[in-house]
Amino acid sequence: MTSVNLSRAPAAIIRRRLQLQPEFHAECSWLKSSSKHAPFTLSCQIRPKQLSQIAELRVTSLDASQASEKDISLVQTPHKVEVNEKIEESIEYVQNLLMTSGDGRISVSPYDTAVIALIKDLKGRDAPQFPSCLEWIAHHQLADGSWGDEFFCIYDRILNTLACVVALKSWNLQSDIIEKGVTYIKENVHKLKGANVEHRTAGFELVVPTFMQMATDLGIQGLPYDHPLIKEIADTKQQRLKEIPKDLVYQMPTNLLYSLEGLGDLEWERLLKLQSGNGSFLTSPSSTAAVLMHTKDEKCLKYIENALKNCDGGAPHTYPVDIFSRLWAIDRLQRLGISRFFQHEIKYFLDHIESVWEETGVFSGRYTKFSDIDDTSMGVRLLKMHGYDVDPNVLKHFKQQDGKFSCYIGQSVESASPMYNLYRAAQLRFPGEEVLEEATKFAFNFLQEMLVKDRLQERWVISDHLFDEIKLGLKMPWYATLPRVEAAYYLDHYAGSGDVWIGKSFYRMPEISNDTYKELAILDFNRCQTQHQLEWIQMQEWYDRCSLSEFGISKRELLRSYFLAAATIFEPERTQERLLWAKTRILSKMITSFVNISGTTLSLDYNFNGLDEIISANEDQGLAGTLLATFHQLLDGFDIYTLHQLKHVWSQWFMKVQQGEGSGGEDAVLLANTLNICAGLNEDVLSNNEYTALSTLTNKICNRLAQIQDNKILQVVDGSIKDKELEQDMQALVKLVLQENGGAVDRNIRHTFLSVSKTFYYDAYHDDETTDLHIFKVLFRPVV
């Protein structure tokens, strides 16, 4: 990994001019002014309308008067060395975590461990088949007498504690522990009344009555058998069982297979035909344990043995979680802005997902005959994004006759997070993918309705910022999202190890919710931001040196151009590309303005010297000379071959401008060509059919987006700009960029066109106040 070299001098400038406080919600001194301005303070809670009034102060606050180009990348400071070492250590930790993922890491479920502990020795001895489960239970009772996650939820605590008490009593072990557990249930059962039903564990109403009956049969004294809430749960179970067709459980894989231990008397042998390839029933250890108790099936036994291997003697609530853990890990790393450190691991993960992909979708673990829209949507999006061939029509399996999408067959109440992942997947749409169009409309409206009610309905995860995450996601579609803007927000939303997942019991997923991910992301974000601030100093110096204000270019416009570059290509080592991006945008505007003002109609061929001729013919030799010097400075330092190509693409662009055919689209293609050439593009590729198609589409898209922005005719429907032709063109561009076709154009080169197009979409979609806020978050707000 390339280290960032920063000198002491610009660091001192930054410290003087960026007096940044660590508290997010306290007043933070954002920028300390230069000598031209009084000290300036901005509250982090500032209203968007105030931001536009700040812009002119902000863009001059980091002035370039004391910095020079050579300051951009010099000696390391001790602090920087320490930061780089921490980053390297974190990267190594995460790499090891990912490459040793195996079946996926997941915390132990007291409930599932207790069910497995009930299994008697299969050879007929009066002993438990899995004594390690009893040992785990005995060693993991909490101080208050309960079992469960540290995040308190009465559903989780009551079920886990009841199951553990029954397991210990079935073997007449640990009477003192049993007594504490019984006391806990008796004293806390009343808390079920008024508890948040969205946090109710999966199958709660099915399995609690079953274990209460088992406790009765074992003669456990003191449990609240007759408590009204316990009776209410039993009544709910009976009502639900009446609604389930009697033979449905035997006919096809449904979510009923997840809670077989709570369904009562079953024809257990008939169920074996629905067994997954790994021996489980819907990846549930407790459900599989129930089948094992009644059938002594060897596959069930082998599955449970495997599930217990890596859980310190206990069992997780589901196993394996190889699909779930891999997909969500990739998603988190991407949104945190640190996926570039783990490209090898991500490819390894996605190769695995592709190898276990089914025509009907995927579930949390491989080898199941069941799928859900959550895992399948995440898989479709990530596979597609990385160039894998995946058919989005797999999502039709989750579409009901009324046009609604459901997480899985039999889901009674839909949750927000699966529908949000469906919405995110549907935004990566290729032409003709109608199911994704339908999914976009349904998911957007479904989520928007929840937001209007100011309350999300969520059954699968407890995350403090899920509401804000979804709200932002609907306001900022993928086309209008820039990588560093996404990372800046997700650093606020990502809870690290604080996220709690809901299954039959609460559980944690260290490959998904991991504090090291966040620590690394914060270190990386701040390191990149420091580099960006130094480059912004250099951009201001360039602005003053080249007298850009005389061409009508404001520092606000300069900042916006640099922000678009830095929010897209943000890596510290890509300084040259960022500065080239920002300066190309500005210089193209300067030249266009100059030519329009000069009113010349001089004809140009592809001779690059035509630009000199136009400028020299102008009466204002001072301004003309400045423009010419600025232009030549942009190209200074490139090798002869690169310079030749740059002159060619700039000449083509200038000819269009001189002939009155300049447009936002032409500017976009110029920018993409300039970036690609400087990245080492072979000249032959410029005339390649695929490259030409990318250029043509980008020109058309960005021209239309520039018109929308200039004419202020933005209309948004279902989260995207309302323009059917523009939408179709964006889909075509996304397909050209993302789909691997074995063509001559490198994937990174193709991505440049999409990146440039997304900045134009961003400009057209977001108003100035929103952009100001994003600039603040990406370039000036520290993350702590």
UniProtKB/Swiss-Prot annotation:
Mg(2+) binds at D372, D374. One of its GO terms (cellular component) is chloroplast. Pathway: Secondary metabolite biosynthesis; terpenoid biosynthesis. The keyword Transit peptide applies. InterPro entries: Isoprenoid_synthase_dom_sf, Terpene_synth_N, Terpene_synth_N_sf, Terpene_synthase-like, Terpenoid_cyclase/PrenylTrfase. It is found in: Plastid, Chloroplast. GO terms for biological process: diterpenoid biosynthetic process; gibberellin biosynthetic process. A motif (DXDD motif) lies at residues 372-375. It comes from the Eukaryota. Keywords: Chloroplast, Lyase, Magnesium, Metal-binding, Plastid, Transit peptide. It catalyses: (2E,6E,10E)-geranylgeranyl diphosphate + H2O = 8-hydroxycopalyl diphosphate. The keyword Oxidoreductase does not apply. Escherichia coli expressing SsLPS and SsSCS from Salvia sclarea and CrtE from Pantoea agglomerans can produce sclareol in high-cell-density fermentation conditions, thus being an alternative, sustainable, and cost-efficient route to sclareol and other diterpene analogs. Yeast (S.cerevisiae) engineered to express S.cerevisiae GGPPS and Salvia sclarea LPS and SCS is an efficient way to produce sclareol in a scalable and potentially industrial way. Substrate binds at R240, R459. One of its GO terms (molecular function) is terpene synthase activity. Its main location: plastid. Its EC number is 4.2.1.133. The Asp-Xaa-Asp-Asp (DXDD) motif is important for the catalytic activity, presumably through binding to Mg(2+). Belongs to the terpene synthase family. Involved in the biosynthesis of labdane-type diterpenoid including sclareol, a diterpene-diol that is used as fragrance and flavoring, and has anticancer effects (able to kill leukemic and colon cancer cells by apoptosis). Sclareol can also be used as synthesis precursor of ambergris substitution fragance products such as ambrox. Terpene synthase that produces 8-hydroxycopalyl diphosphate from geranylgeranyl diphosphate (GGPP). This is Copal-8-ol diphosphate hydratase TPSSA9, chloroplastic. It comes from Salvia sclarea (Clary sage). The gene is LPS.
